């Protein structure tokens, strides 16, 4: 999981956890994790416009849905319980470790917090927060001086903050996939693309040819291989 992390469970084997008492109904942990990660993202993103608040609000809703299932009510486990118990009769899917479904489904028997999908999720989430922080610093300095943001992450992609939100959400999906967050993810992607296009129209009006040259040389979300050119 998130805040409960590896420390409290590092000494327990997977088999012990499979027989543990149900690890849900922990609403304090659900609220605490939601608050910590939302405030953490807020400290990096610092929304100021209505568009910023929409993108941040959607991201926050994703986190609340995720941690509600991680610690509160395991809706996905209940909906898939018939198939899961038939396929994996030895697994107690109401234990916390079994909620790391990718580790369970791919046969990882050790502590799932050290499993390949969990480690990948840490890399995606950590990388997303680093990208979010560095992009905000560049954007803040550019806005204060009335310039177009083209340095740092903006030298590689035009929308690093939206890309950061996607990386963080993808990391949590890998760590703890749920039906609700899987359904929300493509909707949020579509919303971020729409917000990015609206943002580009506004920035183009403000900076004109300078922005058009920058946009022609810099991808929107996926960086090209190699170093950026003159847009730095």
Where do the model's predicted regions map?
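Helix-loop-helix units of permease transmembrane domains in multi-pass membrane transporters
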Residues: 150-156
């Amino acid at each position: 999981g998130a805040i409960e992390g590896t420390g409290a469970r590092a000494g327990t084997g997977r088999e012990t956890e499979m027989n543990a008492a149900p690890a849900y109904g922990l609403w304090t942990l659900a609220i605490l994790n939601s608050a910590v990660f939302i405030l953490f993202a807020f400290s990096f993103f610092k929304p100021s416009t209505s568009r910023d608040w929409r993108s941040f609000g959607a991201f926050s809703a994703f986190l609340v849905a995720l941690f509600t299932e991680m610690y509160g009510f395991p809706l996905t486990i209940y909906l898939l319980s018939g198939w899961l118990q038939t396929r994996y009769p030895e697994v107690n899917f109401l234990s916390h470790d079994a909620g790391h479904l990718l580790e369970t489904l791919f046969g990882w028997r050790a502590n799932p917090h050290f499993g390949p999908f969990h480690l990948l999720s840490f890399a995606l989430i950590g990388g997303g927060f680093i990208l979010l922080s560095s992009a905000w610093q560049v954007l803040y300095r550019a806005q204060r001086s009335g310039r177009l943001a083209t340095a740092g992450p903006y030298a590689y992609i035009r929308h690093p903050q939206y890309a950061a939100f996607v990386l963080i959400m993808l990391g949590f999906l890998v760590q703890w996939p749920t039906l609700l967050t899987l359904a929300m993810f493509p909707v949020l992607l579509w919303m971020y693309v729409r917000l990015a296009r609206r943002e580009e129209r506004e920035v183009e009006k403000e900076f004109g040819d300078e922005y058009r040259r920058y946009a022609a040389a810099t991808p929107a979300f996926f960086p090209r291989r190699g170093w950026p050119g003159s847009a730095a």
